[in-house]
UniProtKB/Swiss-Prot annotation:
Protein species of origin: Synechocystis sp. (strain ATCC 27184 / PCC 6803 / Kazusa)
Name the record gives this protein: Uncharacterized protein slr0964
Signal sequence residues: none
Keyword Cell membrane: yes
Compartments where found: Cell membrane
Length: 308
């Protein structure tokens, strides 16, 4: 994996980790204003639990993927392609839903967190409630990162893990600058740009899901499983329709600059009709919902810079 192919992982982990970091920062700021900083240990417990849960899920998925790789028998490639398609579809659904949900919730997010923390500090044993708020924020974003890595089939790739850690580290530094040093960052613009990039990256996952599904069906047809009828489209593809273009001689998607377009915009040097249709539908539907949410939500998530 080179720099270009690591960009989507960096972008996704940066965005998701910053969302979680902002929640943590808001919680700590609320505790500081309420003069309840003795409860901050529960914040760190929530962070730790969320990180551990995310890592465990990542290890589980990595183990499943490696187990499939080691399975003996002629049907292992079919199972691998089906699993890749399934994980990709789940990642597309979850990332799309969270993108739209965060866009909708951004305006009221700080107020909701403040309300939860204020209620928690007024109750005996409120530290556990604080830890749960932080845990949910961390584990939600952690699961998204893990699913994206799994969909990219990079769970055990050191370079991919490095890109993910770089994104997380950058997010933590940004949160530190905001909450500890009071640096003013335009979070509204940041999340708009990162959200648009995420939308395009997830659109590329849609193309990959269809490719893996087509590969699985093609291999089923060749494996004498009596499923040859699934290849209902003539040509070198079972499900994807006719080939729209073959730009491999001029702009291969495994070399610069094609690999940058592939990783950031879903470009493929071989593109089929149904892939193009699915990509267009995804960007039209999810993109319209996303930009409509941006137009109607007003302010983006705002962080309160509070030294604690």
């Amino acid at each position: 994996m080179d720099f270009a192919s690591g960009l989507p992982i960096f972008i996704v982990t940066l965005r998701e980790a910053l969302e979680a970091s902002l929640v943590v920062g808001i919680v700590l700021a609320c505790l500081a204003r309420a003069q309840q900083m003795q409860l901050k240990g529960w914040v760190y417990r929530g962070i730790s639990a969320g990180v551990v849960a995310s890592v465990l899920v990542g290890c589980l998925l990595a183990g499943v993927l490696q187990g499939v790789e080691r399975l003996p028998g002629p049907y292992t490639p079919i199972l691998k392609a089906l699993l890749a398609a399934l994980l990709g579809a789940i990642a597309v659904g979850m990332l799309s839903w969270m993108l739209l949900w965060m866009t909708k919730q951004a305006r009221s997010l700080r107020g909701e967190i403040q309300g939860q923390i204020n209620q928690a500090v007024e109750k005996e044993g409120g530290g556990k409630a604080i830890a749960i708020v932080v845990f949910i924020a961390v584990v939600r974003e952690g699961f998204e990162m893990v699913l994206f890595l799994a969909a990219q089939q990079n769970m055990a790739n050191p370079a991919a893990i490095g890109a993910a850690l770089a994104g997380i580290g950058t997010a933590v530094v940004m949160a530190f600058l905001i909450f500890r040093l009071g640096v003013k960052l335009n979070l509204k613009l940041f999340f708009q740009v990162m959200g648009t990039l995420l939308l395009i990256i997830v659109g590329g996952l849609v193309i990959g899901v269809l490719k893996n599904l087509d590969l699985a069906v093609s291999m089923m047809g060749l494996a004498n499983l009596g499923l040859g009828y699934l290849c209902f489209v003539p040509g070198d593809s079972c499900l994807l329709g006719p080939l729209l273009w073959n730009l491999a001689p001029w702009l291969p998607d495994n070399q610069f600059p094609g690999i940058v377009l592939k990783t950031l915009a879903g470009y493929r040097d071989h593109l089929y009709l149904f892939q193009a249709i699915a990509y267009g539908i995804f960007l039209s539907v999810i993109g319209s919902l996303y930009f409509r949410g941006l137009a109607g939500k007003g302010d983006a998530p705002q962080a309160v810079a509070q030294k604690s």
